Amino acid sequence: MPSIINASVPGSEANTSEINYMSDDPAQTANEKIYPKDKGYAWVIMIACFFNLGFSLGAVNSIGVFQTHYLKVMFATVPAEMIAWISTASITTTLSCGIFANMIASRLGIRNTAMLGSLIGCLGLLLASFSTKIWQLVLTQGVIFGFGSSILINISLSVLPQWFDKHRSFAMGLIASGGGFGALFLIPIITKMLEVSSFAWAIRVLLIVYALIAGISSFLVKPRIPNTGTTISFDYKVLSDPTIILLSLIGGFIQIGTSIAILYFPASIIDLGYNPTLATNLIMVFSVFSACSRLTSGYLTKKINAVNILIFANFVTSIIFMALWYNSKTMGTSLTFYILFGIFGAPYFAVQPIIVSANYKYEQISSINGVVFLIMGLAILIAVPSIGKVFQTLGNRKDYNQIITIAALSFFIATIFSIFLRYSLLKKQVTSNRNKNSN
């Protein structure tokens, strides 16, 4: 049976070359050059989108370093469920607010919107560097920085498919790996600054790096097809699409399980008797394997059905949580879990945008990604504070088994929904082929 990801759907990647989805900067005109796909400036777009995701999602993936600092140093006497609101706000806003990117870009243009996102992100980090209370960090590091990053992420995921056809799977896999490589770059910087200086200067150094990289990358982003004055609003039809609903549910449950590992694994290493520096440095190990997994998953979708990758990866992840991290008392077992989690827990973040770009019209991509990420963000909003409460009351801030069980169940539920997704896409493909034959 042919792979669903390569199925030809009317209006999908094979038929989007002349769709003007988001307007470019107002200064551009319809007389400007239309760039070719898969070559030339397309590679500049890919690199720019890679860095946008790298330093937006990379900063979010580095939240585990700050979470450990909050739990063990900065807010050591504050209940864990209160501290969890910082990471909750950061992850939730970063994921969910991208739904506004389409509406902003239709008025300001892609480049201006991307630059606005990077500017808002910089403002959030600047204000966070002066914050000393939890509510201040929720607002600055969480909401303001998260909103700016969400705009960059949505723009990058939505504009790239317009530039690639033949090499789309590779390009999407590469930018999806950006968050892992970004975290690999940022984590040692943040960790070192927390050691030798202060929290405030750790944030300020992050601000300098983010402003430089995201600012340049945002300026380089533009649509392949020049502005013709078209304004595209949110496509509400995607809200009732079974495939989109399933993708959103899968993402939501995966995000719950992922957040537990990202936020609590470093702290669990400290509780085994190791120092905080080693614990946070292990996040880099995770980031390497996660980034490579996302890049590889994107490439594998050309050979293996994308949903089959999801089913297998989600099921394996649910097993390793219980087999390796649950009740772990040794560094070897815990590290093995973290490495395998980086490999098998990451494919969704690479194959989800590939599935969307292969099965839907280009002008729907931003709306679909916005909905999927919104559900993922809402899942974090509901789950992370609850997980913090479980860790505080049932685990007494020392026992991780209860939240590990929650993570394992989340990935198992995602496995079930992934099976439903496969049948949904099969049905979609059969319907599409039937319509073609009838015409």
Predicted regions and their residues:
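Extracytoplasmic gate region of multi-pass secondary transporters
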Residues: 55, 59-70, 187, 241-301, ...
